[in-house]
């Protein structure tokens, strides 16, 4: 009796192959079982949640140039809710629910505190007041505003850790905080133009960016590093996947620059914000990309 070959015989093109009885000794039939794809795990499904939230939030922002009035306000509220939820759920998947709650309470709480003091006293941003366009308020501050702090504070914390982590808390707070503050060069002109808040004394201002006093940017450069320092101390230091937060930062930087330049007619805002935010986001994206390449080697 001859032994069975190590591989099945290949049939001629277009014809099924059926082995004859006794052709392989005692083999009576040949059964081929196709490999089944691995089932999608619940962890993979959960990992898609912050991706979906962030992507939907970005889509809401992309629609801004096409909207006005109440539709624009709804899109603004929706984008902040979705992007802040993306930050919190990403932190929950990376570090656990307790850390995510710490992120939300700390960032939103400090943001609310700074804004409430600012509205009441004019310190540290200057004298300003919110309109009634962003929903319910606490202490004169719309609830949405602390969530806006949260949605960018988280990715800026990760940016600060990657770019300034070798210099301890001071390095993380300085780099991450200034990155967060640079965002306001886009944020304030947009919100003032949309009528969400107004400044009592809007001068002196940046060239080409009327309506927002320089004191506002100074206030951000005080509050944002303080917030990042507290978050750095309060949250775990374990490395996390950074693609979703990095994508949010990249979109905020490039999308805001493009929107102000092309759609909103604010070229100076595009210039100031694009340069300032690019000083932090561009090196961060480059460093993150290099790190991912090194990990694959």
Which residue stretches match the model-derived regions?
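Aromatic-rich, lipid-facing transmembrane alpha helices and their immediate juxtamembrane interface loops
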Residues: 2-297
